[in-house]
Amino acid sequence: MGNTFGHLFRITTFGESHGGGVGVVIDGCPPQIEIAAEDIQFELDRRRPGQSRITTPRKETDTCEIVSGMFQGKTLGTPITILVRNKDTRPQDYSEMAQVYRPSHADATYDAKYGIRNWQGGGRSSARETIGRVAAGAIAKKILQQAAGVEVIGYVKRIKTVEADIDPDQVTLAQVEANMVRCPNPETAEEMIDLIDQTRRDANSIGGVVECVARQVPKGLGAPVFDKLEAELAKAVMSLPACKGFEIGSGFAGTQLTGLEHNDEFYTDETGRIRTVTNRSGGIQGGISNGENIVLRAAFKPTATIGKPQKTVNQAGEATTLAAKGRHDPCVLPRAVPMVEAMVALVLCDHLLRHHAQCELLTE
């Protein structure tokens, strides 16, 4: 399994949905980064289940335990281990899934690859694995903010067909956190909540789009050819459970424009800094950040595990039906926001360290 991510700032996540716990080991974190357990807990609380009626009813406090790598509120430069223990496990809810495959879930492919799987809550394929990513992302955010003033903010842009008009240059964390669906447009947020409520009552699920902006990103992050910044961001974000699409800047809509319409023209601002008039490139050109805001979007499919009867097969290939039990999100989007933020922060933090190591080692 590919459980490790990153180059200089590396994370390895561990644990299963209904095992003893989940967590992360972070290697390559610089020393003397100021971070409190409360900073990590804040991000985990945004991700945790049971926080509202439109998320899974599983009740977990997701309390983080910092096992190593920190002392007196600062990082030591040694491996950081963060553990979150599972409390509200109900493996009996998944007993039927020991033999029967959930449509569009990882059950069948895990069996095909490994010949064995933890069917209790999906095991390693569960979104509970992302706890380690979000915890590591909290530290990456601190490094980015303290070293370069970078701010990473995600929000729900669309739920099924309900879409919000949001300015990524102006959106604030307070606006995002002002409602349970994490859409900074209050009117659209209410429409989204009503749609998720209706879907939940129908024992079904829906998907949507998370948009994320990284502001004040320094120029020069990323590298040709295979380590282009947008390629690294795409891999990171699409490694999240249920993520089925990724675009940056103008994305697929840019294919409808001509070069003259799409190109971001340059100018020099009043401080002498070279800027672009528009930002259809999404803050990245030639795989390298250009100093403009990085704007990306991630598409998340409807949750695979639903309560409606579906045709499927068991491990023997025999036809059957499954109406899944257990506790599941009718829509993953509200809880996916901190996950997307975390993966973006991890990539930017890793590339910030790599840029300093390669290009600024001998500069004054």
Swiss-Prot record:
Pathway: Metabolic intermediate biosynthesis; chorismate biosynthesis; chorismate from D-erythrose 4-phosphate and phosphoenolpyruvate: step 7/7. GO terms for biological process: amino acid biosynthetic process; aromatic amino acid family biosynthetic process; chorismate biosynthetic process. One of its GO terms (cellular component) is cytosol. Its cofactor is FMNH2. FMN binds at residues 124-126, 286, 301-305, 327. Its EC number is 4.2.3.5. GO terms for molecular function: chorismate synthase activity; FMN binding. It is an enzyme of class 4 (lyase). The keyword Amino-acid biosynthesis applies. It catalyses: 5-O-(1-carboxyvinyl)-3-phosphoshikimate = chorismate + phosphate. Reduced FMN (FMNH(2)). It comes from the Bacteria. Keywords: Amino-acid biosynthesis, Aromatic amino acid biosynthesis, FAD, Flavoprotein, FMN, Lyase, NADP. The keyword Lipid biosynthesis does not apply. PROSITE patterns: CHORISMATE_SYNTHASE_1 (PS00787), CHORISMATE_SYNTHASE_2 (PS00788), CHORISMATE_SYNTHASE_3 (PS00789). NADP(+) binds at residues 47, 53. This reaction introduces a second double bond into the aromatic ring system. Belongs to the chorismate synthase family. Homotetramer. This is Chorismate synthase. It comes from Acaryochloris marina (strain MBIC 11017). The lineage of its organism: Bacteria, Bacillati, Cyanobacteriota, Cyanophyceae, Acaryochloridales.
